Design a protein with these regions (language model features):
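Histidine/lysine/aspartate-rich catalytic loop segments that bind and position anionic ligands
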Residues: 149, 158-175
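ATP-dependent adenylation/nucleotidyltransferase module used to activate substrates
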Residues: 1-159
Length: 175
């Protein structure tokens, strides 16, 4: 069984899944897999924020439509958080905690127990305070669990004809 099959089986075992969906390479592949195995029990959840370019929000809408996954939005204005506008050294950690909290609340209110994101095995090579924050928050990282690298995600995405397979990485506007 290859990695994609193992991830699909793991997704299936979750019964219902919220995918934290940015419309990037990683979350698009994860949303596609979730939609294929869970059908209507998968939802892509996008945070709509002033720190996310409008173009990215529109692309996320289009990608979710292409995949056929239910797509929901949560509005968040990180710029209203005193802790974040002070720009502390751990702002990425704090921002991820804030985002995870609103996603967890949405999931709970809508009957979902499991939330997954597109963090991948290659992300562990960089300084990523969001990995620590989201792990603490109980967010599932299937691409890390199954040791799927960014290169593999691009390759799988290309094979599945996802238009994001060669999409460049997008840095956070707060960085």
């Amino acid at each position: 069984m290859d990695k994609l099959q193992r991830i699909s089986e793991a997704i299936k075992s979750k019964k219902k899944l919220v995918v934290m969906f940015s419309g990037g390479v990683d979350s698009t592949l994860l949303a596609k897999l979730a939609r294929e195995v869970l059908e209507k029990n998968a939802v892509a959840l996008t945070i709509d924020s002033p720190v996310i370019p409008r173009k990215e929000i529109e692309e996320a809408k289009n990608l979710a439509n292409l995949i056929g996954i239910r797509h929901e939005f949560i509005e968040l204005n990180e710029l209203k958080s005193r802790h974040l506008i002070e720009n502390p050294p751990d702002r990425c950690y704090l921002c991820r905690k804030l985002r995870d909290n609103i996603v967890k609340n949405w999931a709970r209110e809508n009957g979902f127990d499991v939330i997954a994101d597109g963090l991948n095995f290659s992300d562990l090579q960089d300084y990523r305070p969001g990995v620590k924050a989201s792990t603490e928050d109980g967010i599932w990282h299937p691409f890390i669990e199954f040791e799927v690298t960014k290169e593999e995600i691009r390759d799988f995405s290309r094979k599945l004809s996802l238009p994001t397979w060669n999409k460049p990485a997008m840095a956070c506007l707060c960085s």
